[in-house]
Amino acid sequence: MIAKICGLQSVEAAQQAVDNGADLIGVICVPNRKRTVDPEIARSISKICHGTGTRLVGVFRNQPKEEVRQLAQEYELDVVQLHGDEDWQEYASYVGLPLLKRVVFPRDVSLVSQMDGEVCTPLFDSEAGGSGEKLDWQAIGSWFQDSQLTRGYLLAGGLSPDNVVEALRVPGVVGVDVSGGVETDGTKDLAKIKQFLELYKVNVN
């Protein structure tokens, strides 16, 4: 089971996530989004991660694979997250890093059976991502139980300290991913990051 704090834009928030045991922290590498990370801050966050056991994820959306690989090298990413309509197999072989691939439920569920958990892990999220829109967890859990799949998925979309315990109980979940749910007025809230991760740890151990 893993916990991911996404959409980080400050060294302070990244340090809080690392100090409180986040497995993954994510920076948005898509240009001109409200949570797009400043390149200098991304490099600083990368330095915070290395040697701690927390892995750095770069989030991309329909960007050329050459750009993805360039930024992956520049920021020393550990994982690449594809949030658009990319062919994950093409990107996996070119970028050479483990992938998270956004899956919209129920539209994209046929893709999940094609994903190899070692190379590409599905991440259920809304179409836009980062919107705070809660998915239909019951429907996703029921689909997973009926699917006969052995590999699980990360769950995003509308998570917060208020519902992370519920999210961890959804069938097939191997990780939880939060962004807006640990913000106050559009900025990462250090207390909420700590609360989310503490609740996560208590309920997975």
From Swiss-Prot:
It catalyses: N-(5-phospho-beta-D-ribosyl)anthranilate = 1-(2-carboxyphenylamino)-1-deoxy-D-ribulose 5-phosphate. Belongs to the TrpF family. GO terms for molecular function: phosphoribosylanthranilate isomerase activity. GO terms for biological process: L-tryptophan biosynthetic process. It comes from the Eukaryota. Pathway: Amino-acid biosynthesis; L-tryptophan biosynthesis; L-tryptophan from chorismate: step 3/5. This is N-(5'-phosphoribosyl)anthranilate isomerase. Gene3D superfamilies: Aldolase class I (3.20.20.70). It holds the Pfam family PRAI. It comes from Zygosaccharomyces bailii. Keywords: Amino-acid biosynthesis, Aromatic amino acid biosynthesis, Isomerase, Tryptophan biosynthesis. Its EC number is 5.3.1.24.
